[in-house]
Regions:
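Charged, compositionally biased N-terminal leader segments and the immediate start
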Residues: 1-18
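Peripheral, non-catalytic segments that deliver or gate enzyme domains
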Residues: 19-57, 61-84, 88-112, 117-441
Length: 441
């Protein structure tokens, strides 16, 4: 069987920054109903099936082998938000997860917020995008894609009655609640280019929709969120090299304010605590530094430096809590967490292995002494920890079980460096059976 060849229909594309000819623009059928496009996609699928046909048995064998090592009936570590513990669980032979919560009290019954398997009934596919609970815990804003084109519809569920108002907005990329529990903000992508460029305010019943912002520069996308403190709604406008942030106090009327004027090449992000914004910014160099400014009168020239710029350390993220903040850094290719007090003291979370991967976990609570993170390595399965900033200890909450007789102690992992021709040290991560190198010079 010969592979299908897409025909060429030259189409001129113009923008502020470029002009080009796209021979395959005709394939951008957003209605999913153009017969010629559908015929071509069917031909591509048929060709794939034909080429892969000899491997059918091997595909099934590999699938069953990998499935045998996965615990299908499982539950994630719950995280606290307000007066509830939220979690996601999976069930054997079910394709999609179930999202649940329990009240923060003994013997509280489980509340199912979203059963993705039930939502998928009658559909070939479903994907959950954003998932935001209102401050009072009574409303859930969530987005779903049922076609596989990553175009999400916004729905609102009443968590008291269980009723859902479907599709109050379309092509939604991000969503966040205002503090009145009745107003939402969301960003929307363009139907053709898929660039996220529109920012709306809307009531939870789908009424009173207002366009707040339209980003006209085609190089930029936008996204909205609320700070962990719950005090500010932030609109992030960014290209691959430049950031601009707009912000507004929750619950207050008025326009969004620009944090710093847009400047080509300047990137930054913010979090909030008290009267200050804590900002990760690259004004001193590509590796970023951390500064703070007065939230209601942010002037970069008057910023207080919290973490200085360093040539060998990349600052990747900052998370503010009520009594501490965490700076995520990368040095020599490895992530570490600097736990910082607002008085200036700081220390790192220690890891035992020399080769590992780590990422911040579900840290939604602002008033907490715990920092959650995920950790894994070549020999350590994905593990969830809570780090106590007072005792400086990490508590293992869950480790992903690996079925099939895997024993981590039978293996070793190390990290070595090799020098390139320009004397640059290149990290090399090794994993091997314990004892395999014994007797070697």
């Amino acid at each position: 069987m010969q592979p299908p060849i897409a025909k060429k229909i030259p189409t001129e594309r113009k923008s502020t920054y470029y002009q080009t000819v796209d021979d395959y623009a005709w394939l951008e059928d957003r209605t999913k109903s153009e017969p010629e496009v559908l015929d071509y996609l069917k031909a591509e699928n048929a060709y794939m099936e034909s080429v892969m046909a000899p491997t059918k048995e091997l595909q099934e064998e590999l699938y069953q082998e990998m499935r045998a090592r996965i615990k299908e009936d499982d539950q994630e570590v719950p995280y606290r938000l307000g007066s509830y513990w939220y979690y996601r669980r999976t069930e054997t032979d079910k394709q999609y997860p179930v999202y649940c919560r329990r009240k923060d009290k003994d013997d509280a019954p489980e509340e199912v917020l979203l059963d993705m398997n039930a939502l998928a009934e009658g559909k070939k596919f479903i994907s959950l995008g954003d998932y935001e609970v209102s401050d009072d815990g009574n409303w859930l804003a969530f987005t779903t894609d049922t076609l596989g084109f990553r175009q999400y519809d916004l729905h609102i569920k009443n968590l008291v009655t269980g009723e859902t108002q479907d599709r109050i907005a379309t092509r939604v990329d991000s969503v966040t609640w205002d503090s009145d529990n009745a107003t939402l903000y969301y960003t929307q992508e363009d139907e053709v280019t898929k660039r996220t460029n529109l920012f709306f305010r809307i009531k939870r019943d789908g009424t009173d929709e207002t366009l707040v912002y339209n980003e006209e520069d085609e190089l930029y996308n936008i996204q909205c969120h609320k700070t962990r403190s719950g005090s500010y709604i932030v609109l992030v406008i960014e290209s691959s090299t430049t950031t601009e942030l707009h912000y507004k106090r929750v619950g207050l009327a008025g326009e969004f304010r620009v944090l710093f004027p847009r400047l080509e090449g300047r990137e930054y992000m913010l979090d909030h605590r008290g009267e200050e914004f804590f900002i990760r910014i690259n004004d001193a160099g590509k590796n970023f530094r951390v500064v703070s400014v007065v939230a209601e009168k942010p002037v970069l020239e008057e910023a207080q430096e919290k973490i200085a710029y360093r040539e060998t350390v990349m600052i990747e993220d900052i998370d503010c809590f009520q009594d501490f903040f965490v700076v995520t850094e990368r040095e020599r290719g490895l992530i570490r967490y600097q736990v910082c007090s607002y008085s200036g003291e700081r220390h790192s979370i220690e890891f035992q292995e020399s080769v590992y991967s780590t990422s911040a976990g579900d840290n939604y609570e602002f008033a907490t002494k715990l920092f959650r993170y995920h950790y894994e390595s070549f020999i350590t399965p994905d593990s969830t920890y809570d780090y106590d900033i007072e005792t400086r200890t990490s508590t293992l909450l869950k480790q992903l079980p690996v079925l099939g007789g895997y024993t981590p102690k039978e293996y070793e992992t190390v990290r070595v460096f090799a020098k390139a021709s320009d004397d640059t040290e290149v990290p090399i991560s090794l994993v091997y059976k314990r004892g395999a190198l014994e007797g070697e010079p």
